[in-house]
Amino acid sequence: MEKQRALVAAKDGDVATLERLLEAGALGPGITDALGAGLVHHATRAGHLDCVKFLVQRAQLPGNQRAHNGATPAHDAAATGSLAELCWLVREGGCGLQDQDASGVSPLHLAARFGHPVLVEWLLHEGHSATLETREGARPLHHAAVSGDLTCLKLLTAAHGSSVNRRTRSGASPLYLACQEGHLHLAQFLVKDCGADVHLRALDGMSALHAAAARGHYSLVVWLVTFTDIGLTARDNEGATALHFAARGGHTPILDRLLLMGTPILRDSWGGTPLHDAAENGQMECCQTLVSHHVDPSLRDEDGYTAADLAEYHGHRDCAQYLREVAQPVPLLMTPPPPPFPPPPLLATRRSLEDGRRGGPGPGNPSPMSLSPAWPGHPDQPLPREQMTSPAPPRIITSATADPEGTETALAGDTSDGLAALQLDGLPSGDIDGLVPTRDERGQPIPEWKRQVMVRKLQARLGAESSAEAQDNGGSSGPTEQAAWRYSQTHQAILGPFGELLTEDDLVYLEKQIADLQLRRRCQEYESELGRLAAELQALLPEPLVSITVNSHFLPRAPGLEVEEASIPAAEPAGSAEASEVAPGVQPLPFWCSHISRLVRSLSLLLKGVHGLVQGDEKPSTRPLQDTCREASASPPRSEAQRQIQEWGVSVRTLRGNFESASGPLCGFNPGPCEPGAQHRQCLSGCWPALPKPRSGLASGEPRPGDTEEASDSGISCEEVPSEAGAAAGPDLASLRKERIIMLFLSHWRRSAYTPALKTVACRTLGARHAGLRGQEAARSPGPPSPPSEGPRLGHLWQQRSTITHLLGNWKAIMAHVPARQLRRLSRQPRGALSPEQFLPHVDGAPVPYSSLSLDLFMLGYFQLLECDLPAEERKLRHLLCFEVFEHLGTHGWEAVRAFHKAVTDEVAAGRRAWTDGFEDIKARFFGSSQRPAWDTEPGRKSGLTLLGPLPHAAVPCSGPEPTAQRLGSRSQQGSFNGEDICGYINRSFAFWKEKEAEMFNFGE
C-alpha cells in the first residue's frame, strides 16, 4: 500500500505526501513499478521539478536510477520534452549527458524521435555527439527522419551533415525512413538541400520508392517518380517492383497512377505478378484496376498458381470468383481446363495407382479439393510453365520427381510438381561443432582430435540418409534400410529408426519362416535336379522301362509366403560358446538375442518379398555367421578405429596429428590389433581403448545390443535424459546431448519425408508386372499385393512398414498444397513467435487451429519452422523444447505435451519471457519434477503384437478433430492407422535415436 501511495504521489507531484512517507521511513530506491521505473522516473515524466529535487536531495534517492530497460530519468525527460528537469538531472542529479539504455538509445535520440527541437539544440550545445549510434546502428538523424520534425532534422544535419546517407544495420537511410513514414517535406529537404542518394537500398533490396508505395504514401510516390531519377522498374531482392508493393497493400490510387505513368507489369523472382499479390491479400479494387489495365488473370507463378488460386487459398472467395469470371472471355479457354490446385505429378501418380488398387478414393483419403478450390479438370494434366529469368531463393528449394522407371532427380529451383520442400543439407559445420563439448562430465578436457571425431560422426549421421539414397541402385523400397535396427534395453525389444518394434515372439516366428523358405528353396533345387536326371534317363533308356516324375505336391511350402522367389542364404546355427560369451560384470542379454544377426540380415529381404519387390535373380551377398560372430566377439582398438574411419570418413591419426602436438614420439598407427589382455591406457595414440566384448554375434559394422549402456558414460543414461543437470553432468553437457538427440531424430524423419517416393510405387508396379509374366509359377501362388493373412505376427510386421510408408506419403501430399510463397514469407519476415500450424496448408482460407494439430502435422510444421532464419538462442531453445515434447510424449500423451509447447510459445509471444529465460517452471507445472520418465511396458511383447492399442485413460487421444484430420489427409491407404498408432511409432523412434546418440558419443577414455 505504501509503495502504491508513493508512486501516485510522485506522478501527481504531491510533495507533502512524499514528506510524510519519508518521515515514516517508507521511501527508498526499491519502490518501482512493474517496468522498474522508480519515483524519480515518474516525477520527471510528469514534469514536477520540485518533486524531483525533493526525491534526490532530501530522500537521497539516486537520480540516475535505471529501469529494467536501462533508461534513466534523463531519458524520460528527453522523451517528454521536459527541458528544466533534463538540465537539472544532467547538471546536478547525477545523470550523464550521453547515457544510453539497454538498446543504445541516448537522450538526444529520444528528443529527436519525439520532435523536441529545443532539447535537441540544448543537448548539441552541451556537447552531445550527433554521431552516437544505437545497437541497431541508428543515429539521432534517423530518429528525426522518423519523427517528421523538420527543425530537428535541420539541427542534426547542420551538426553532422555527412550522416545524411548513413544507413542502419538493416540498411535504412534517413531518406528511406522519411519516405516510409510519409514525410514529403523531409524527403524534399534531404534530396534537394542535403544531396541524399535516392538509390540507396535496405538490406532486403527495398528502395525509398518501394517503402513509400508499400505504406501507401501517394504524394511521395508521385514526387519521387516525377522529380528524381529513381526507376519505375526497380526491384528488391525478391524481384518485386513498386507495383507489387502497392498491390499487396491495397493502395489502388498508387497502383493506378503508376500504371498510367507506363510502369510495366513484371514478374518477381518466383513468377508472381502484382495481380497475384493483390489476390493473395484479398485486395478487390487493386485486382479490378490491374485487370482493367489488361493484366492477364490466367498467368501462373512458378508454383502453378493463378491469382484466383491464391485468393481461394487464403479465403478471399469474392476476389477468386471475380478473377475467374473475367478470365472466361480470354482465348486461353480453348485449352483444356486447369487441373486441381496444385497439380503435383507425384501426387497424381500416387493417387491413380492407389485408386486402381482400391477401386476409387475412399472416405479416409479425401481428394486435395478439400484443401483447395474445386475445379473440374484432369488430375494428371501437367501445368503450363512460364519462363522465369530470376533465380530461385537460396533458403527454399523444391523437389521434382522423374520418370516412373525408378530414377529420380532433385533439381534446385524446379517447382514443376508444386511440391514445396526443404533444404536437405544439414546445419553449418560451426553449429554442429558447438554441439560437442570441450570437457567431459568429470571436467576433464576432451582431446581436440577426439572431439573432431565426434563432430564428424554427427555430420555423417545427419547426412547418412541422403548418402544412402544416392548410393541406392533402385532396389531400396522403404525406410527400414536407412538405419540399422537395434536392441533397446529400455523397451526390451528391437526398435527401428521409425519406431518399428520386433519382440521375442516376432523373431522366433521370423526365424521359422526363414527356415521354411530355405527348406523350400533346397527342395526346389532338388526337384530341378531330379527332373534333369529323369530326362537324361528317359533319353538313354527305352520309354516303357523308365517313367520318372517328381511330385511337387509333397514338397514343403512356406505358408502364406509362396510369392517369395528370392534365394535366402542359409544361416548357420550360432555357436553356443560365442552366443553366451559376456564381458565380466555385465548383465547378459536374453538368450533369444543370439538370433538377431541372421534375422536382421534377412528381415529386409523378407519384407520386400511380402511386397513382391524381390526379383528371382536377386542374390544377396552371403557372409558366414561364424566369421561375423568372431568379428563381433572381439572388438580390439584397431577394429574400433577402423570402424570409425570406414563409417564416418574419419582419419583418427590425421586428426590427432592436426589437433594434438606431441611432446614425445607418438606411437605409430599399428595395423595389428592391440593385445586383448592389454590394459586400457597402454596404447597412447593411433587407436582407442578396447571396448567390452559384445553380448551377441552382430557384425562389427552394426550397432551391438548393450553398446548403448556401455557407451553412455557422458552423465546421462540411455533410459533417461534428465530434465535438469545432475551432479555428474553439467547443464551444458545435458543440453548439448538433448540438442544432438533432437537433431538426429528430426533429421531422420525430415529427410524421409522430403525424399521423392515415386520410385517405390514404380518398383511395386514393376514387381507386380513381372510376377504376372511368370505364368504358371505365379498361378501356383496367391497375388502379391494382399497382406499376409496367416497369423497376426507377419501381418502386423507388414502393417508397421505400410503405416510408416503411408505416413511419409501423406506428408508429401500435404506439403503439395502449401504455396512456396507462404513458406518464403514466414522464413523471411517472421511476425511474432512462429508456430508449426503456420507452415501447413490453409483450411477454409485460414491456418489450421493449433488445438486441432495431430502429432504428425505438428512434426511436419516443425520441419519447416526450423528451416527459418532464427536467432541462435531461439533455435537452441526450440530444439530443447522439442526434446521435452517428445521426451514426455509416452508418459503424458499428445494433448498434454501439445499444451505444454503452446504455453511456452505463448509466454514468449506475449513478451513475458525471452527464449534465454528457459522454460523449466512451465515444464514442472505440466510434467512435475520427476527426472526419470516412467517408460510404458510393452503389453503386446509376449504375444508378438505391436502396442497399437489405446493409450491409458489419463492420456488423451493423439489425433485432433476428425474433420480437420480428414481434410489434411491423415488416413492411409491401409485405412486404419490413427493418432494413437502414430504416437507409438514416434515415441519408439525417439527412444531409438536417444540410444543411437548414446552409442555414437562416448566422452570416456
Curated annotation (Swiss-Prot):
Residues 468-480 have a biased composition (Polar residues). ANK repeats lie at residues 1-31, 35-64, 69-99, 103-132, 136-166, 170-200, 204-234, 238-267, 270-299. The keyword Repeat applies. GO terms for molecular function: actin filament binding. Its main location: other. PROSITE patterns: ANK_REP_REGION, ANK_REPEAT. This is Espin-like protein. The gene is ESPNL.
